[in-house]
Amino acid sequence: MRSAAKPWSPVAKAGSHGPDRTRPLPGTPSGMKSSKSSTSLAFESRLSKLKRASSEDTLNKPGSASSGVARLKKTSTSGAISELTESRLRSNTGTIPTTKRTGIPAPRELSVTISRERSVPRGPSSSKKLGSSPTSSCNPTPTKHLRTTPAKPKQEHEGAEKAVLESQVRELLAEAKTKDSEINRLRSELKKCKERWALSTEDANASDPSAEGTASPESDAQPLIRTLEEKNKTFQKELADLEEENRALKEKLTYLEQSPNSEGAASHTGDSSCPTSITHESSFGSPVGNELSSETDEYRRTTHGSALRTSGSSSSDVTKASLSPDASDFEHITADTPSRPLSATSNPFKSSKGSPTGSSPNNASELSLASLTEKIQKMEENQHSTAEELQATLQELSDQQQMVQELTAENEKLVDEKTILETSFHQHRERAEQLSQENEKLINLLQERVKNEEPSAQGGKVLELEQKCTDILEKSRFEREKLLNIQQQLTCSLRKVEEENQGAIDMIKHLKEENEKLNGFLEHERCNNSVMAKTLEECRVTLEGLKMENGSLKALLEADKQKAIEASSTVGQTAENFEVQEMLKVARAEKDQLQLSCTELRQELLKANGEIKHVSSLLAKMEKDYSYLKEVCDHQAEQLSRTSLKLQEKASESDAEIKDMKETIFELEDQVEQHRAVKLHNNQLISELEGSVIKLEEQKSDLERQLKTLTKQIKEETEEWRRFQADLQTAVVVANDIKCEAQQELRTVKRRLLEEEEKNARLQKELGDIQGHSRWVTGRATLLPVNEEPEPSEADAAGRWRGVYVNRTSPAPSDSATTVKSLIKSFDLGHSGGTGQSISVHKTPRSPLSGIPVRTAPAAAVSPMQRHSTYSSMKPASKGTSQRLDLPDLPLSDLLKGRAEDRKSDPYLRKSPSLESLSRPPSLGFGNTRLLSASTGGLKPSKLSVERRDPLAALAREYGGSKRNALLKWCQKKTEGYANIDITNFSSSWSDGLALCALLHTYLPAHIPYQELNSQEKKRNLLLAFEAAQSVGINPSLELSEMLYTDRPDWQSVMQYVAQIYKYFET
C-alpha cells in the first residue's frame, strides 16, 4: 500500500510476528497542492482494480479474505533475509560497527536513512513548486524476524534453486517498478504542463501580446521532452549497472554458500539480493529519487558528510537495516490506490485528532531515533536469547544422540541376553516337564501299590515307619550328645596339650640360654689355655738355653780346675799366681750365682708343668660336661618336638571329626535350602525375563512410532517444499503479468501525452482567436477549472484513502491468522493433533532459502523472541500512547492490541505469554519424543535413564521441550509476582543479580531483603545471592567480576548455577 509522502526518518514499528524492524520513509519534497483531472483519476482507479484482480486471482487461497499485505508474506520474508546477509557482507567497510560473529544471526544494526531531493528543470514562466505523486512513496509492511537454521550440505542444491527463483522474481519486480516510476514521472510532467498552460493563459490575458503567450508553452514542452529522453537513457544505464551489480552479489552469495565457514552465512542466504531492490526503490520508487546520480551524490555529501558513503547507482552503500522492498513492491502494485495531492493529513507524526499543525521534523527525528535505539536493544536481546536457545538445543540434541547410541548398544546386549535366557528358559521348562511326568508316574505307581495292599498291612507299615522315625530321631539325638561330649573332651585335652607345649617351649628357651652361657665360658677357657701354652713354650725355650749355658760353664769349670791343679803345682811362682787365685775366686762366685739361678729356674719349670697339667685336666672336664649337656638338650628337644607333633595331629584329627559330624548333620538342610533358593532364583529369572521382553516390545513399538512420525515429517516437509516452489512459480507468473501491464500503461500514458500535446497546440490556436474578449470573461473562464476541479478529485481521493486506511488498520484477526497458518502449515507438525492448543499469532516462521523448516522445541511454542515482541507490542497499548504511529502499518496490530487489553488485568502475565497461550502440554516433537514415549509406556527407568544423569530431565518432561527452556519456565514461574524481573534468557536477564535474589528469596526470605534491592546495585545483589546460596551449601560457580563488568555473562555458567539451585531445593 502507498501512503502520502513522509519525512525520511527511521520509524520503528511493533510487528506481530517478530522483533521490531526499522524502515526508511520517503522524504517530503517541498511543494504545494496539485490538482488532478477526472480522466486521470478514472484511469488510475481502473488500472488499480485490474492489478488487484490479477493479484487476487493468482495469490489468494481459499478461506483468506485479508488484504494484499497478508497475501505477500513470503516475498517480505525473503527480502528480510536478503537484507541481513548484505548487511553482514558490508559490515567490514567501516560505516557502521559490526557485532561479533558467533555462527548465529547477529542483532541488526541501526539503519541509516538518507533524505533526497531533486532539482526539477522549470520553464521561465513557472513560479510554483511541483508536488510529488503520493503513489511513488511506499510504506513497507513489517516483516518477520527469522531464526533460520544453518543450511545442511544436502540442501545446497535446493537453496541454489530457491535463490535463482527469488532473483528472477526480484528482477521482474524491479523492472515493473521502473515502469511504474516512469508512469508516475509522466503523470507529474502532465500535471506540470497543465499548470503551466493555466498560468500562461492567465499571463496572456493579463498582458495582451499573444505571441509571447503562444511561444512559451511550445518552448517549455520541447526541453521537457528532451530531458525526459535523457533521463530515460540514464535510467537504462543505471538499470544495466544494477543488473551487473546484482550478478556480482549473486556470485558472492554462491561463494559464501560453498565456503566451509558458511554456517553463519547459510542461515541468511538470499540476503545479497536486498541491495538491488533497495537501490531500485531509491532510484525509482518516488519522484524524489528520480534525480541524476551526480546530483544525488552532491546533495548527500552536503547533507550527511563523510559518515554516510552513498552512491546513486551502487547498492553497497544503501541503508543496512531497511525492510525488504519486495513486499512493498507487491503491495503497491497489487493494492495500489489512486494518487492524491499532498495534504496535511498525510503526515504520520500528526496528533490523533488530525490537526493541521503536525509535530516538527526535529521532534519526529528525535522520536524515531529514540524508538530505533529501543527497538535495536530489544532486537539484540532477542537475538542473544535465540542464540542461547539454539546452543542449548544443539547441546541437548548431541546428548540425546549419545543416549540413543548407548540405548541401542544396550538394546543389542539385552537382545543377546534375551536369546540366552530364552534358550535356558526352554531348557528349564523341558526339564520341569520331564520331572513332572516322572513325578506323575511315581504317584501313579504309589497309588496302585496302595490299592493292592490291604488296609491292615498299610496300618502296620505306618506304625513301623513311625517307630523307625522315632528310633532314628533318638539315635540322632544320642549321637549328637556323644559328639558334643567328645568335642568338649577334645577341647579340654587340646587346651592341656597346648599348656604342656607352652611349658616345653619355655624349657627349651631356658636350656638354649644356658647352652649359650656355657659356650661363652668354654670359649673364654680356650683362650686362656692358648695363652698358657704359649707361656709354656717360652719357658721350654729358656730352659734349653739355660741347659746349654750350664754345659758351657761346666766345661769352663773343668778347664779352670785343671789350671788350678797346674797352678797348685807351681806354688812357688811369683805374683802371677796371686792373680790366678783372684780370678778363681771370681769364677767361684759366679759359679755360685749361676747355680742359684739354675735352681730357681728348675723350680719355676716344675710349677709351670703342674699348672699345665691342672689346666688340661680342667679342659677335659669342661669338654665332657659340654658334650653331656648338648646330648641332654638335643634329646629333650627331640622329645618335645615329637610330643608337639603328636598333639597337633590329634587336634587336627579331632577338628576334622567335628567338622565331618557337623557337615553330616547339616548337609540335608543345606541341600533343601539350596534347592529352594535355586527354585526361587529360577522363578525370579523367569519373571524378569518376561518383564524385559515386555519392555523390549514396548520400546520397539515406541521406536516404530518415532520412525513413523519422522517419515511423516519428512514427507510433509518435501510436500511443503514443492508447494513453495509452486508459489514461487506463481509469483514469477504474476510478476510477468505485472510487467506486461506496466508496459501497456507506459504505452497508454505516452499516447495520452501525445494527445495532450496536440490538445495543447489546439488550445493555443483557440487562445489566439479569443484574445479580443474582455479580461473579466477570460479570468472567470480560466478560474472555474482551476477552483472547481480539485474538489471532486480531492474528495474522491480522500474517501478512497480513508477506505484504504481503514482496510490497512483493521484487518480481521481470523483472516490474518489463517493466512499465516497457510504460509507455515507444515512447520507445526507437533501441534497439529492438539485440539487444546491455541497458538494462532505466535507461529514459527520458516526461511524460504533453507530446505528444512525452522523448528523450535515443542514446549517452547512461543520463543523468547516472540514473547519479547509481544511484550513490546503490548506495552504501548497499556500505556495509552498514540495509536497512529503503530496501527497504519501493521496488518495484525488490532489483534495484538486486543490481546494486550485482555491481558492488561494481570500485570505479571507479560513475563511469560507462552504459558497462557498453551492450554495443555504439547504433543510429541523431535526433542522429547523418546522421553514422553517412555513415560507414557509406564517403563521403569534404565541405568542410562535421564533422571540419573541429570535431574533436569524430570523438569523438561514436566514442562516439555528442552532442559534449558524448562528451567527458564521454572524460573519464570518461581519469580512470578516480583517487580523488575523479566527472565527471557540465561545471560542478560541475570546480570544485575535481581533475578537470582528473587529466585533465592522464594526459598530463603530471611537471607535476602528483596524490597530494599534495586537493579543499579549489581555488586550488592550478587553478593547477597551468593552468600544466601552458600549458606545452604551451594558453592558459587559464577565469577563476580564477570557478572559485574559484563552485561552478558556466559549463559552456560549461569544456567549451571541456577540448575544447582533447582537441584538443591527441588530434588
From Swiss-Prot:
Residues annotated as domain Calponin-homology (CH): 961-1066
InterPro entries: CH_dom (IPR001715), CH_dom_sf (IPR036872), F-actin_Monoox_Mical (IPR050540)
Compositional bias ranges of the Basic and acidic residues kind: 153-163, 896-909
SMART domains: CH
GO biological process, one term: blastocyst development
Compositional bias of kind Polar residues: 90-101, 256-285, 336-349, 866-884
Biased amino acid composition, Low complexity: 28-40, 123-143, 350-363, 912-922
PROSITE patterns associated with the record: CH
Keywords: Coiled coil, Lipoprotein, Membrane, Myristate, Nucleus, Phosphoprotein
Coiled coil ranges: 574-773
Region (Disordered): 1-163, 192-223, 250-375, 831-922
Annotated compartments: Nucleus
Residues where Phosphothreonine is found: T77, T141, T357
Cellular component terms (Gene Ontology): apical part of cell; cytoplasm; cytosol; fibrillar center; membrane; nucleoplasm; nucleus
One Pfam family hit: CH
Residue list for modification Phosphoserine: 38, 55, 76, 111, 133, 136-137, 360, 365, 368, 424, 847, 863, 912, 914
PANTHER family per record: CALPONIN HOMOLOGY DOMAIN-CONTAINING PROTEIN DDB_G0272472-RELATED (PTHR23167), CYTOSPIN-B (PTHR23167:SF3)
Annotated family: Belongs to the cytospin-A family.
UniProt-recorded name of the protein: Cytospin-B
Source species taxonomy: Eukaryota, Metazoa, Chordata, Craniata, Vertebrata
Gene expressing this chain: Specc1
